[in-house]
Amino acid sequence: MSRRLQQINLGLSACLCVSLSALAAESPTVHVYNWYDYIGPNTLHDFKRDTGIEPVYDTFDSAEVLEGKLLTSRSGYDVVVASNFSLPTLIKAGALAPLPHAQMPDFKNMDADLLAKLANNDPGNQYAVPYLWGTNGIGYNVDKVRAALGDKAPVDSWELVFNEANLAKLGQCGVAMLDSPSEMLPVALHYLGLPPNSTNPEDYKKAEALLLKLRPHIAYFNSSKFISDLANGNICVAVGWSGAMLEAKTNAEQANNGVKIAYSLPKEGAPVWFDTLVLLKDAPHPQQGLAFIDYLMRPEVIAPVSDHLNYPNGNRSATPLVAEATRNNPAVYPSAQALATLFTLQPLPPATERVRTRIWSKVKNGQ
């Protein structure tokens, strides 16, 4: 290559580098990792419009995938949406950066009651802020449950599914439960008046006995199939997530198939879960990450997300901006009285997790 050509190429390379550097300076980015289909249709577009920051957005479909990515290597992400249940593991591993609340002017909008519950997984609310949240309860076919149990069916109580006499009748029209020992065993313990996050093996023996007694009347354990089956009338009762039950209700209404679905948050109390916004300790763009988190704490930003997804957010100031039909639906926004009965789930010691895994295998197999 001639010296002249080398000089030309060097000049072009220099120009290209300068151009790319200028472009990078003009177009800051933030890398976000979220659950699939878990944001408003215009949120990312509006964030770029309002801040000038380009969101690079990827999705995952299970907490195990998220934890695997964050705990085994540098992920390259700035902000991730992590469940409250994952927080203790991520905090202990040193994967998260403390959030500088003083640099987040919209943190003041967070619901103090929800922050107090979240503190069970994130002491002092150092690492996470609520994004969206929900509950675990009972979805049911109004007409079929009435036909099976009469007008006084205890649809507002765990008695509906943990009382063997009730479940035997409901089993004729189909009952499904989550395939999740970490969610179902705490509910069984709570029904029995035992600590839902117990580490006592004797408590789990009692929960095992209860579930084995009920097993003949449960059609299946699955964490997704129940949505379509409930909407289509193939089952009449399911234990699962609030948003999933509302999805089944919406699907039935859109199909105009005559199936009436309702969601009940049992009066005895139930699990509450939070999906939270966290900043990674090795975030390549921490300031842009903070900007993204703070943006989602703006009331006018998060309210349309709740409307779109039918999940409540953790922002007290956003509630008046949420559509009336959404904010007045106790299946989406539980009352203060109901909220006081909810409990969070905790990661348990490995020995207890092994006990839960063994019990769940026996329950699913019916032996």
Name the predicted role of every residue range.
Residues 97-108, 255-271, 280-283:
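Short beta-strand->loop
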